[in-house]
Structures are given as C-alpha cells and as structure tokens.
Amino acid sequence: FKQAQHKRVGILTRLPLSSGLLTGKFTPQSIFAGDDHRAFNRRGEAFDRGETFSGLDFQTGLRIVEELRPLIPSGFSMTQMALRWILMFPAVTCAIPGAKRAEQVGENASAADLPPLSEATMQKIRELYEREVRPHVHQYW
C-alpha cells in the first residue's frame, strides 16, 4: 500500500471477502459444487492459487474467521467488517466484492457508510493478519 500511495496510484481490491470466507457463513462441513473454484482450485490446480480463499487453506481460513468474530462491532456483519477494514486503508480506492443475491449487494455497499473501525480493532486485525495470513500467502504475490 505504501508504494502505491507514494506513486499516487489507487488500489482496487479484488476478492476482498476471500472467496466468501470473510462472510462468516462457511463451516468445516460446507460443500461447494463441483464447478465452483472453491472446490477444484484450492491448491491452484486450475489457475492462480491466490484466486481461491486468497491463497489460504480452507481450514486455516475458517479458524481465522472464528478469531475475527469477537471483533465485529455492534451493528456490523462479518462481511461489513471485512469490507470496512479494507476500505480503511487510504491507498484503497475501491473494493470489488462478489455477490450472488441482491441483498448481498446492499450489504456490501452499506459497509462504506458504516463508521470507521476503532484503532484497537484495526490493531487486533493487523496482528491476526501478520500472525496467521501473511506467512501463508505473501510468497505468492
């Protein structure tokens, strides 16, 4: 993000919900259709590994989501917190989440109008990211 800001380049974030992981709706028992990339590309078998769950192993992602749940501010959904988090970075000009239903579009869009996350929440998410996400994915970028 720092380099983009230095060069005055905006960042459009793709997959800010990590293929749905950050909606909080999946469980270890979740099953994806055979033609869903979350079923057939978990280890990058068909295309870039980072396209599925942002490069994380599904079980690792589920564990991280459970660690995030206590941080969700009152009045926010997990989805909204995840989107609000990425939009808190000054270099990010737009987040492009996917949606299958109209109500998901509304929930996604409303995240931009929610109050900023507290510095304490941002710090806890940052610590979780550095500890649990960065070691698994940054070598792919």
Q: Where do the PLM segments sit?
A:
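Conserved short secondary-structure transition element at the edge of the structured enzyme core
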Residues: 13-17, 45, 51-113
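Extended hydrophobic/aromatic segments used for targeting, binding, or gating
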Residues: 111-141
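Glycine-rich, positively charged active-site loop/lid region within alpha/beta enzyme cores that binds
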Residues: 2-71, 135-140
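Alpha-helical segments flanking ligand/cofactor-binding loops in enzyme cores
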Residues: 1-2, 84
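Structured helix-beta-strand junction loops
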Residues: 6-8, 75, 128
